[in-house]
Design a protein with these regions (language model features):
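Active-site metal-binding motif and surrounding structural segment of the metallo-beta-lactamase
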Residues: 39-100, 238-258, 289
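Short alpha-helical segments and helix-capping/turn motifs at coil-helix boundaries
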Residues: 13, 80-88, 165-167, 233-236, ...
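Active-site neighborhood of phospho(di)ester-bond hydrolases with catalytic His/Asp-centered motifs
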Residues: 27-31, 60-74, 101-105, 217-226, ...
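Long, structured stretches of catalytic cores involved in phosphate-ester chemistry, encompassing
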Residues: 226-332
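Short, solvent-exposed loop/turn segments at the edges of secondary structure
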Residues: 11-13, 95, 199, 244, ...
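Conserved beta-strand hairpin/beta-sheet module of binuclear metal-dependent hydrolase folds
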Residues: 1-63, 200-226
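Short, solvent-exposed loop/turn and secondary-structure capping segments
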Residues: 16-19, 28-29, 38-39, 75-78, ...
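Flexible, acidic/histidine-containing loops and adjacent segments that form or flank the divalent-metal
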Residues: 1-3, 58-59, 75-226, 294-375
Length: 375
């Protein structure tokens, strides 16, 4: 059975839905950004996700991952999901989470409010009770917090997953035909020992298998080029270059130039070497790059002068690198058109990854396009 990936039009915000071969649903981030203005082109995310659950025959998400706790990744989560820690977040209209994935800061960060506070409370509750959670962290980073609950790392090891590991519970050889390799958060070795880096952000490589074919996607939170370079260096050091291959790349930080370099450039952002190697050498043929963002601005417009992403210069780099491999560059808020953006749905089969009809409401009604990679 094929797997599917869906990217929702939410402006500069992230929500990605993975539908595995067995119809289990994995949600990466939840950002309900649509306002009350009827002209708002951003999708009604709660309705869209309920429709996806119905189409898959599921009443809960196998996994909900909050890749980091900025509002553009979690907005409205405390109003949509069933949280076990408090009855105020429970009710017949709320959607349950079988397993919660969070970065270390969802446990350790003291100064949170709103949706971030609620997610932290739910994460702490599940970790304390020892069920339904994976904390992406170096285990030692959580020792102090576990000790406050009279718990040890060993007692909660099954709830913790570190960089360089596969997330337990998933295999490309089981019914879901999918696995996840953890790149971040990670520890960076310095002269004084290990230093935790990017502990607020999850980055994973997804491998989806069908038949004898595998397809890969790089997915994660808002990280800059320095962190991305360290991920590349660490992965290469451990001989895991294959864990950086990708057919699908969900851009980090809404097509910001800062994920490529500290220098924006006049018309194109030239990446630092490690990032260039990742994006140019490890991309598979006919790759698909998705920018979860507002439309790419035209040169010299007011939007182009805005310091916030998306940045035209970064987009020009991505458009350049796909030309040699017949790839595709998609922007959530301009696909299929700027006036009427729809979810971008990718279908993963033994023939490769295909963009399916973006106006389709569900997998069962989607019309497939030509696969982006053969073999």
């Amino acid at each position: 059975m094929p797997a599917y990936m869906t990217f929702f039009p939410l402006g500069n915000a992230d929500t990605t839905l993975l539908r595995l071969a067995n119809d289990d649903l994995i949600l990466l981030d939840y950002a309900n950004m649509r306002g009350s203005d009827p002209t708002d082109k951003r999708i009604d995310l709660p309705k869209a996700l309920r429709d996806e659950l119905d189409d898959a025959g599921r009443d809960s998400f196998r996994v909900v991952a909050f890749t980091h706790l900025d509002d553009d990744h979690i907005c409205g989560a405390s109003e949509f999901f069933w949280f076990d820690y408090a009855r105020i977040h429970q009710g017949p209209d709320r959607i349950k989470i079988d397993e919660l994935w969070v970065p270390a800061t969802a446990i350790t960060e003291p100064d949170l409010e709103g949706d971030a506070w609620s997610i932290r409370q739910e994460a702490r509750h599940r970790l304390k009770e020892g069920y339904g959670i994976k904390v992406f962290s170096r285990p030692e980073r959580l020792a102090k917090y576990l000790a406050e609950w009279d718990l040890t790392i060993e007692q909660r090891q099954h709830c913790i997953v570190d960089a360089g590991e596969l997330v337990p519970g998933f295999s490309k050889y089981d019914a879901g035909q999918c696995e996840f390799f953890v790149h971040s958060p990670f520890a960076w070795r310095t002269n004084t020992g290990l230093e935790d880096r990017n502990e607020g952000s999850i980055v994973v490589q997804m491998t989806a298998r069908e038949g004898n074919s595998e397809s890969y996607a790089l997915l994660g939170a808002d990280i800059n080029h320095e962190t991305l370079s360290q991920i590349v260096q660490t992965t290469r050091k451990h001989g895991n270059e294959h864990r950086l291959h990708w057919d699908v790349l969900k851009l980090f930080h809404h097509c910001s130039y800062k994920s490529l370099s500290s220098v924006k450039g006049e018309d194109i952002t030239e990446p630092v070497e490690d990032v260039r190697w990742l994006f140019e050498e490890l991309a598979r043929e006919k790759e698909i790059i998705v920018s979860p963002s507002w439309p790419i601005p035209e040169k010299s417009t007011q939007e182009d002068l805005d310091a916030q992403p998306p940045h035209r210069q970064a987009a020009n780099y991505y458009k350049k690198i796909i030309k040699d491999s017949n790839g595709q560059f998609k922007v959530t808020m301009e696909t299929p058109t700027r006036s009427n953006p729809k979810p971008i749905k990718l279908k993963i089969t033994a023939a490769g990854v295909a963009v399916v009809f973006t106006a389709a409401a569900s997998v069962s009604s989607a019309a497939a396009a030509v696969p982006t990679r053969a073999g």
